[in-house]
Amino acid sequence: MKNKILTIVIPTYNMEALLGRCLDSLLINGSPNSALEVLVIIDGATDRSSEIAHGYETRFPEIFHVIDKPNGNYGSCINKGLAEAQDKYIKILDADDSVDSTGLMELITVLQRYDTDLILTDYSLCNTEGDVLSRKSFNIDSYTLHNRQALTPLGAHMAMHAVTYKTENLRRIEYHQTEGISYTDQEWIFRPMTTVNSFLYLNTNVYRYTVGRDGQTMDIDSMARNMHHNLTVLRNLTATYSDVNRDDDIYGYLRNRIEGYAEYIYSLYLYNTERMDLAPLITFDKDLSSLCPTLYRYLGTLYAGKLPFVKLWRLFYYKKDHGINNFFRYRRYRPNLKK
């Protein structure tokens, strides 16, 4: 595998309908890309996902490798993929998504020419038919090596779809993604960033992110059932954030990232109180005041319209044993929920 440069890890659970499209997008006019290693991690799937993946492995053994394992959720697939990856760089591709073949080739060319810790690329949001709805880019010079401080303004809008890491950096910090829960992709764009000293942005679309599919973890019904998973992830991010020195150049990125994510979680909870069990949020919020006072204070400054909604929620719920859910049912007070 000496000519290979990039390992793509594909966590896969019951994706028989879309896995073929995903794997096809990694081929060049139907032929294997010799610079790629593709690890398809079958996470205890009960449909034909494994059969489909093994079919590609049989046809293109030089790039596709299938790993069947018991179900352990998303993070366990990332951990397995990282352990097995043999190439200099690593990228995650979800089985219901795909890549832009032209953009992928440009990314590979850049990986072969530059030596850096992180490569950021554009990604597009697509509907289930594959039509591009929008494209996400970064307001920073392309084809230029930047230092880690330049990540600061990008923190609030970072997504796992945009990142490609140097593999050895993640192993050096013994990176381990939380297993058994959803939404751990947030961890992938947090602690690994502490290993970045230089990065390059390539304003080419590589990743095609499918939205609007029934059963996605970002579906509001799925999120309502699993919001405690988000809180577990946020607690993990808080531990990393608290350990980083404020003078570190990466601190600004982590601050922007965790503040945006925390605001998103609190907003979803407090504007969907009829669907949510608030007990986990109350426990987390009480712990947060001592775990990370700066984040606790920041959340208290958030406004919806003219209402400091988190501050009021804390005041009414904690001190009067009385919720203020009615404040959050009026659309004029709804905040701008960040994606």
Q: Model regions: which residues?
A:
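Acidic helix N-cap motif at the loop->helix transition within catalytic regions
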Residues: 20, 47-56, 68, 98, ...
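Donor-binding/catalytic cores of nucleotide-activated saccharide
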Residues: 74, 78, 95-200, 209-224
